[in-house]
């Protein structure tokens, strides 16, 4: 990391109470201040506006124009974004991110508001800079602040806007940008998308519907040659937003996308008062967003959020009884278990329908007339069939009219007006994860399900589980309403640790049903899932995302294959290293089950995929997410390394042409289409790459085995 000091000083001396010293302001015509890490540079002008540059090869690329990158908005709507640069200092620091350098820049606005900007650079994170801002009101009048904004940057559409000709810009067929945005929405939209002119999305990390919210506090925009990302690194979830926009009204050769982080909260800054923002980052990368998520995961691990250990059973394939839906019978499930075992499945999941209601969690007396004894016997039947038993559960929800509401209304999470908060799917209400009574009630349920009934895993399900709104229940005595928001991850930690105390090999799957996973919850589960994907594309993009956030060998479950394209796209899960699963049914009188019947034709296909899965076990390999760009590279490509081989997965409606094989270290590789059992010959490597001529529809799965100097495996 290096720093370019200012060389010329103006003659006027200005007193800066924030630093308790008198500081000399900088000549506004002087060179900009440059704060660098090895791969990224922030340049600040005399008004403390900034722009980002990247050095990820032999040249520096300026990514956009100067912006008012850190500023305040007053209650009246005034932007305070011009701060005359007064001084800058630099010193070495040591933190949980390692040894690094901190540059402090100080500026003052015309109304007397002072800005102290700290920029930290660590060799451990060479393409990233970390930022914190403190504002101090040194004027004699109070300021009412409604919002702070940070990391407001521009990414130009063209690699060099000054030399982009109009014809090139007009004839470009691919999108200018792709983007990853970590917010959650009720329509369960894609987390990764191309940006079209006119695009805008607020990406609020709170609730974007009554029961959809939270997410991963990162936004990333990339063009074909370079990407730009921002995020916050607080150990608690915060109600910030990450707006991403791509205006439609800019000249075609000056097109640019924008992103920033903001927090809307009214704060009165009396004379002498200070306001400090969150710790945030700005990062640059090549190819897609995977490098950003990997960096973010590593940063948060150094700060204390470490992903859970994973038992081998978390990689085993799954059969789920949800094909029979809520009106299942035990005869239906029990007659299906032998077929599940025959196909190579290792888990059987009892889904929704075993309980009388959400909240009470009493056993349905029609299905369990003998109560706990019947449930224990059912679990033993699953184990006798050679399968492990997992149970569905939707905590933090309580149905109207239940004993819990009648006996414990104080457990409810309440809105500001005192009303209950709806969980729409189950027509229920939110419970508050910060309330100790809710926490202990959940602990007792986990002890019953895993300890008394004998289940070896939990499928914790519901879009309401990803985030919760602020709680205004006076019975809870919260320090702030946001206490519920920040307590959710700790609630999951309690559930996870309780489960591990009972069974250290228990599989804890949390399925937030269409939400973008809240990163702060991830350390407290050991299996994620594509959570009701709308398309096979979502299966793949969610897999790439969660491998980035949890680890290259994290057990990500592709969900029931029946939710994929054509209800049979095993390849989208298999090729990215996802756990396979199904909810097939056997003949019965259950109408809901008819669409999932395992007929003889399907059985052959299901058997082939599960046999191949158990043979290869790709989720235990290493997902190489930085080799290909999920947006710009065509065909879409994913790679898993395992046991010395490389497994490439290509996806397209149809493709004929040459495939570029990246990440190769040997001189030659034997290539096999391992799904169809076809020998595709030998490829020779040049500069870590090789090419393979291919013709396929939907998918192509190939294994590359390195050959020795004599051509042997």
Model feature map: region roles:
Residues 328-342, 439-451, 566:
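Short, acidic/polar
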Residues 344-555:
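Aromatic- and carboxylate-enriched substrate-binding clefts and catalytic-loop regions
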Residues 291-347, 351, 355-356:
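An acidic-aromatic substrate-binding cleft motif
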Residues 142, 236-301:
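Extended acidic/polar, glycine-enriched regions
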Residues 20-21:
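C-terminal motif of bacterial Sec signal peptides marking the signal peptidase cleavage site
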Residues 42-46, 273, 277, 492-681, ...:
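Active-site-proximal substrate-binding groove within the catalytic cores of carbohydrate-active enzymes
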Residues 26-43, 50-246, 674-679:
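Polysaccharide-binding surfaces and accessory modules of carbohydrate-active proteins
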Residues 39, 133, 272, 319, ...:
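Conserved, mostly hydrophobic/aromatic
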